Amino acid sequence: MKKVIITPSKLRGSVKIPPSKSMAHRAIICASLSKGESVISNIDFSEDIIATMEGMKSLGANIKVEKDKLIINGENILKDSNYKVIDCNESGSTLRFLVPISLIKDNKVNFIGRGNLGKRPLKTYYEIFEEQEIKYSYEEENLDLNIEGSLKGGEFKVKGNISSQFISGLLFTLPLLKDDSKIIITTELESKGYIDLTLDMIEKFGVTIKNNNYREFLIKGNQSYKPMNYKVEGDYSQAAFYFSAGALGSEINCLDLDLSSYQGDKECIEILEGMGARLIKNQEESLSIIHGDLNGTIIDASQCPDIIPVLTVVAALSKGETSIINGERLRIKECDRLNAICTELNKLGADIKELKDGLIINGVKELIGGEVYSHKDHRIAMSLAIASTRCKEEVIIREPDCVKKSYPGFWEDFKSLSGILREE
């Protein structure tokens, strides 16, 4: 599919929110590190999740697919030291989580990928490799990382403002090493919510880590993961698209959301309420955001970078000025998301100025429409689809298939909510 052509209309109806990609990554990893059989249910087989499944299989996990379930047995994880190739596709989570895991025992591994993945920072791990004399080589731009050796317990100093994925990768790994370890966070920690997800999942699988106010993490060695059955909860980062559409006037009931979730992207509710939208709890695990008199605000992107593109859509149609701050990390995602969402929404008639680490958005009453480009980024494509609900004319989105990275059923769900689109 080269493009979708959307006729502007309000979305109406109920939608089952897809399972959390963040939680699924973590559950698959913990189950694969457990000695015994786990069943992980409510899986959405997006490209990123498939990359993590295949990566853990390469490391020795036995993973069987039964409909939306995974039967995982980690008895043979890292049992052999044969050369391994792990294809991360475009998944930053797969790459950064599995690099340290692959070094639990002496190993020789080649990580490959595509798209923008090779441009995303890995210096945190390179510094650890050098300190521990782990051999490594890599190619600039394209992801082709070769590593050889094993990780040892001890003290790890990690910056908290690059990516929380490095910290999560170490949190998965260090409990399985012989010696005790300590992770010291040397800067302000961004995306704390993702660390909470990791700690919660690790604890569910029987591993204990002491969190000293996110400044350091104390990890006893020689622990083991215990198999369990786990159902993946609904994804707030995907619900954010429908919440935003609701704030802009659509009427959508979002199903399968855990109100007690640790997901950091749940913050989208608080942000939208702060702008003037209203939250309606329809029934258990069912939420709607209702349109209100929307006003500009200040949005700190440091703790919830993934929902910034669609919140920019809402801000573009709110009264007054909205500032997106602390968003420099959005430049090193699947694309430069600050530039992409600014460029494409301005094509539709928005008034957005791009800054080094954020955006200044002056709200307009309506968007016009036109042809835009997804930048092959799933969150940009879905954000532009939500923007179309408030356009006067058709919106043409080029390269829409990129949604398969995280939400393969997005366009079908969009149509099920009375979205009017045709594919070419």
UniProtKB/Swiss-Prot annotation:
The active site annotation covers: 306
Query: Which keywords fit this entry according to its UniProt record?
Result: Amino-acid biosynthesis, Aromatic amino acid biosynthesis, Cytoplasm, Transferase
Please provide the Gene Ontology terms (biological process) for this protein. Answer: amino acid biosynthetic process; aromatic amino acid family biosynthetic process; chorismate biosynthetic process
Q: Tell me the enzyme class.
A: transferase
Positions that bind 3-phosphoshikimate: 21-22, 26, 163-165, 191, 306, 333
Positions that bind phosphoenolpyruvate? 21, 92, 120, 165, 337, 379, 405
GO cellular component entries = cytoplasm
Give its E.C. classification number: 2.5.1.19
Short name of one Pfam family: EPSP_synthase
NCBIfam families the record matches: aroA
The record's family statement is: Belongs to the EPSP synthase family.
Q: What is this protein called?
A: 3-phosphoshikimate 1-carboxyvinyltransferase
Organismal lineage: Bacteria, Bacillati, Bacillota, Clostridia, Eubacteriales
As recorded in Swiss-Prot or TrEMBL, the protein's gene is named aroA
